[in-house]
A protein has these predicted regions:
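A short beta-strand segment in extracellular, disulfide-stabilized domains
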Residues: 17-22
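Solvent-exposed, conformationally flexible loop/turn segments
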Residues: 12-14
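N-terminal Sec-dependent signal peptide, specifically the hydrophobic helical h-region
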Residues: 1-9, 62
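Ligand-binding face of N-terminal immunoglobulin V-set domains in extracellular IgSF glycoproteins
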Residues: 16, 61-106
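N-terminal V-set
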Residues: 23-63, 100
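Flexible inter-domain hinge/linker segments at boundaries of tandem extracellular adhesion modules
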Residues: 1-4, 37-39, 103-106
Length: 106
């Protein structure tokens, strides 16, 4: 039985943070999704097969607008200009394998 990782991340308001996928490169059939804990909202996605990278930064009243950057090689997610609205749990799903990040904003 494999338990998902839950990685605590501390960041100061106004700073940027990168949530690392720990991938060095993506494979041809990789699908990577980042979700925010409120309603399990999809905020970013890479579908290698479809050659598509998408950030959904208008969700949740636009709290992520112009703040999300997705690394096309590793799938890591950077959130810029952090506010307390970004506090909480983020789920990284790579081909159905889940890891979690808990973001603490001060």
């Amino acid at each position: 039985l494999i338990f998902p990782l839950e990685i605590p991340v501390t960041v100061w308001e106004g700073d940027s943070v990168t949530l690392n996928s720990d991938l060095t490169e993506m494979k041809d059939d990789d699908v990577i999704q980042w979700r925010f804990w409120i309603e399990n909202t999809l905020i970013a996605e890479i579908n290698v097969t479809a050659d598509r990278i998408t950030v959904y930064d208008d969700v949740l009243d636009g709290r992520f607008r112009d703040r999300l950057k997705l690394d096309k090689q590793t799938g890591s997610l950077t959130i810029t200009n952090i506010t307390t609205e970004h506090d909480g749990e983020y789920k990284l799903e790579i081909n159905s394998v889940e890891n979690f990040f808990i973001l603490f904003v001060f």
